[in-house]
From Swiss-Prot:
Gene3D superfamilies from the UniProt entry: Glycogen Phosphorylase B
Protein name in UniProt: Glycogen synthase
Family: Belongs to the glycosyltransferase 1 family. Bacterial/plant glycogen synthase subfamily.
Residues binding ADP-alpha-D-glucose, per UniProt: 15
Top EC class, one word: transferase
Alphabetical keyword list: Glycogen biosynthesis, Glycosyltransferase, Transferase
InterPro entries tied to this protein: Glyco_trans_1 (IPR001296), GS/SS (IPR011835), Starch_synth_cat_dom (IPR013534)
Superkingdom, taxonomy of origin: Bacteria
Keyword Transferase attached: yes
Involved pathway(s): Glycan biosynthesis; glycogen biosynthesis
Any GO molecular function: alpha-1,4-glucan glucosyltransferase (ADP-glucose donor) activity
Catalysed conversion reaction: [(1->4)-alpha-D-glucosyl](n) + ADP-alpha-D-glucose = [(1->4)-alpha-D-glucosyl](n+1) + ADP + H(+)
Pfam families the record matches: Glyco_transf_5 (PF08323), Glycos_transf_1 (PF00534)
């Protein structure tokens, strides 16, 4: 099949969140299955310094009253084709934000549609998040191109209908309330990035006011778990780590722990229980829970906590105060550092992910791969990837809690600390976690199956009368038919 992935990010060149990992890492696994897979992204100015870009465009056209050009490049690691949509709107230096963000990504979506019709025509056009949400609307009229839309984070939904009408001249019934709704209505298949998240977003608690629409389209909705690049993330070959290790020489991992303690200003003692966290410091990630339980945990146990990330100023301030109050036991680096993040994965004893919601989550997969035991809230992709530790049956890969409450999180932390004191059992837990298989090849087989199901097939056009029922804020109604 000819498959084109359209997105705002593609790792490693352009990456803000998990979407960049998916778009960068999924194509090579699909190519191994025999498909012609390419990616199209906005032509951010920095890319011309990071990639070898064709001197002449492969396509020129005009859309939304603006001329644009499409250039060809190759992925720097995997060597597949990447198309860059060139226009001055992408020269600002930032990926997200800015006063023209809505217009910028709607223009990118329109340019991608023009390119797909008139230059390189895919059989499947795979769109990612609201930035590409209008593509399924425009491609719906083409019987030769099937569209797939992936929801990475339902919270971000794109420009509203009045702005879309002004920018695209499409009447409201062609896109519903916003670009996220547009994509879900017109895409031939829709998937979320984990099976549990696909179920959760059909409920009021996690539906972000789109649960009614998601129940309506549930017949074409599924969940496919993200993966990780096992070659890029391999503790046995990771040159960033002071000491490489695998399941056969786990003892070497202690050297990483000692160096992590030194680098983050913690007391150097390999027997201390060291909790790590690499995260955006925002409410979604449960940082407020960390703030609420840390003092009690440090008072009751001999634990240490090492946190790396940036985000909300108030959360950063709270973490900084804890570091001042508990020198040698609590450390926070308010930045992002790839080398230090790898050291936290490869040196901490356990890894914190007390998320409010988590569409899939990559960090828990990396933590397990590197022998750091995840402590997670049972939500979204964390349910699908972390199995609760059961010492009696010698099973499980992490510690889990259900409610987003400090006492529940604290209880899970204490259980993990107590388990850490039993070295043989803890080592068995580490070995089980490190043996889990979350490769992109597994995910690629599921995406391939979905592509085959949809290739050459168009979902029925949405019923305008039904669309009217799903204005913003509409609750789910299980009696409604599904597409």
């Amino acid at each position: 099949m000819r498959i084109l992935l359209a997105a705002a990010e593609c790792a490693p060149m352009i990456k803000v969140g998990g979407m960049g990992d998916v778009v960068g890492s999924l194509p090579p696994s699909l190519i191994k299955l025999g498909h012609d897979v390419r990616v199209i992204i906005p032509g951010y100015s920095k890319l011309w310094n990071l990639l070898e870009v064709s001197s002449e465009p492969v396509f020129r056209a005009n859309t939304m009253g603006n001329d644009f050009s499409v250039y060809e490049a190759k992925h720097p690691i995997h060597n597949y084709v990447i198309y860059l949509v060139g226009h001055p709107t992408f020269d600002s230096g930032h990926i997200y934000g800015g006063e023209d963000e809505d217009w910028r990504f709607t223009f990118f979506a329109s340019a991608t549609a023009e390119f797909s019709w008139n230059c390189w025509k895919p059989q499947v056009l795979h769109c990612h998040d609201w930035h590409t949400g209008m593509i399924p609307v425009w491609m719906h009229q083409d019987p030769e191109v099937s569209t797939v839309f992936t929801i990475h984070n339902l919270k971000y939904q794109g420009p509203w209908r009045w702005k879309l009408e002004k920018m695209t001249w499409c009447p409201w019934y062609m896109h519903g309330d916003h670009t996220m709704a547009a994509a879900m209505l017109y895409a031939d298949r829709v998937n979320a990035v984990s099976p549990t998240y696909a179920d959760e977003i059909k409920t009021h608690e996690y539906g972000e006011s789109l649960e009614g629409l998601l129940n309506y389209i549930s017949g074409k909705l599924r969940g496919i778990l993200n993966g990780i690049d096992l070659n890029e993330w391999d503790p046995d070959k990771d040159k960033v780590l002071p000491a490489q290790f695998n399941i056969k020489n786990l003892e070497s991992r202690l050297e990483n722990k000692i160096i992590l303690q030194k680098e983050m200003g913690l007391e150097v003692n390999s027997k201390k229980y060291l909790l790590g966290m690499v995260s955006r410091l925002v409410d979604q990630k449960g940082v407020d829970l960390v703030l609420q339980v840390s003092r009690r945990l440090l008072a009751y146990t001999d634990s240490q906590i090492a946190i790396l990330g940036t985000g909300d100023r108030s959360l950063e301030s709270g973490l900084w105060q804890l570091a001042l109050d508990y020198p040698g036991r609590f450390s926070v680096f308010l930045t992002y550092d790839d080398s230090l993040s790898r050291l936290i994965y490869g040196g901490s004893d356990a890894f914190l992910m007390p998320s409010r919601f988590e569409p899939c989550g990559i960090s828990q997969l990396l933590a397990m791969r590197y022998g750091s035991i995840p402590i997670v809230r049972r939500v979204g992709g964390l349910v699908d990837t972390v199995l609760p530790h059961d010492p009696e049956n010698n099973s499980g890969t992490g510690f889990c809690f259900d409610r987003f409450e400090p006492i529940d999180f604290y209880t899970a932390l204490v259980r993990s600390w107590e388990a850490f004191r039993h070295k043989d059992s803890w080592k068995s837990l580490q070995l089980r976690a490190m043996s889990q298989e979350f490769s992109w090849q597994r995910s690629a087989l599921e995406y391939e199956s979905m592509y085959k199901d949809v290739c050459g097939i168009k979902a029925p056009s949405p019923d305008i009368a039904e669309i009217e029922k799903f204005s913003y804020g509409q609750s789910a109604d299980p009696s409604l038919k599904t597409m």
